[in-house]
């Protein structure tokens, strides 16, 4: 994000409030990446908004405080076969990337479903949880700026939802929180 993104969001919400009193300007601190997050970043965000006299409508949501909710959704996806456990190391993934590039394979997915045959490795070495994307379909979203955007699923990576330590990635946390917060308009910086 940034102050420009906050201003755009704030202006859009203020206009929307004139037509629909249910619109809210929400503030969420997305701090699931501990290496890139610290208290000073949060302080800077709050001070910047205060300096501009921009007030959020509800309590601040801190993503790292919603760890259990994010893990719950990942485990639900595992249970319902919408995700899988992956034991691939970075070196294995790099070899797959090189192979795909050399052989001009367009499928972005580097990690196939590997949990069935590797139960011992899952227990001893740990695993990440990845989203399971099926090749045979397309995904379409409606974007305010670009209109209808359709992507072949084979071009979407089986991205990580939970890291080896069980912590959620941004890709999981942001979607769960958007859903739980009732977000229906997203403008990101």
Where are each of the predicted segments found?
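Active-site cores that bind ATP or allylic diphosphates and position pyrophosphate for catalysis
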Residues: 63, 79-189
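N-terminal Rossmann-like or analogous alpha/beta NTP/dinucleotide-binding catalytic cores
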Residues: 1-102
